[in-house]
Every structure is written in C-alpha cells, then in structure tokens.
C-alpha cells in the first residue's frame, strides 16, 4: 500500500536587510546573496524550512525577520511588486495569469497553496493558473522606514532593530512601503 505524503506547510518569513555592504565578511555576504538580499532595505519572503532558518540565523546581525501576514504581503505586492523589465505588478497582469486579486495571491502563498511567489514562465493549460506569478522579481525594494530605526547594531530584544521580531515585522514593513 502506498501512503500519500502530506505536504508540509512551513511558516512564511519576511527578511529585510538593514545593514549595508562595506565590511561585510565574505561568508555573510555569500549567504545574503543566496537569500537575494543584495542591497540595504531589500526584502524577500521565504518559507521557514530548516535550511532557510539556518541561513537567516547566520546573517542575523545584518537582517531583521519575522512572520508576515497575508494582508501585509498583499500590500507589498501591490505597492512594491515588480516584474521583469522593472515594470510594476498590476492587477491586469495578475488577471492575465488567472489570479483575481493581490489578496488571493498573498493568501494562497501564506497558506501553502502555492510554493513560490515568483518563477520563470511556466506552461499551463487553458483555464488553469500557474503555481506562482510568472516573471515576478523575487525581492522587494523598500524605502527606509518612516520614523527611522532605533539601532542597526543592537538586536530587537534589547531595543535595536536586528534579528527576530515575530509578527511585529508587519508594522516595520508598512512603515517602509
């Protein structure tokens, strides 16, 4: 008898780079590059797999991270989402690929219905929608936060801005849109 494996749905984390490029050790720079955090104030949304969590913990002194909710992700997609060619992600583009709204895409990603937000072009049959948003850039360029940061040298638990901040990451993201 074959048992069907249930799909494991990992939590989705938003990771924002807060510190710049100079004096970054090579191994940290490589890990940031693999996470697609190549510039200050860029954000990626990643699943919380053990390997990704290990990478985030390695660069913990350069980033802040926490669980993103569907409303914040929909807002980020709407305001800061870009497709290849640096064109804005529009509702018409989503509807072309079978999605009805930004909220629908965000909820599908957070709940694990789709595994990735962005992908290269995929072949789909007529009437089906792809398991991602084709040609979406896998990172989001954000503004510096309104009201500023406390400290990019201290961790969040001691009054700074670096490291794990849990669901409070959503407040920071809204300040950076």
Curated annotation (Swiss-Prot):
Signal peptide: none
GO terms assigned for molecular function: RNA binding; structural constituent of ribosome
The keyword Ribosomal protein appears for this protein: yes
Membrane-spanning parts: none
Subunit structure: Part of the 50S ribosomal subunit.
Record PANTHER family: 60S RIBOSOMAL PROTEIN L7, LARGE RIBOSOMAL SUBUNIT PROTEIN UL30
UniProt-recorded name of the protein: Large ribosomal subunit protein uL30
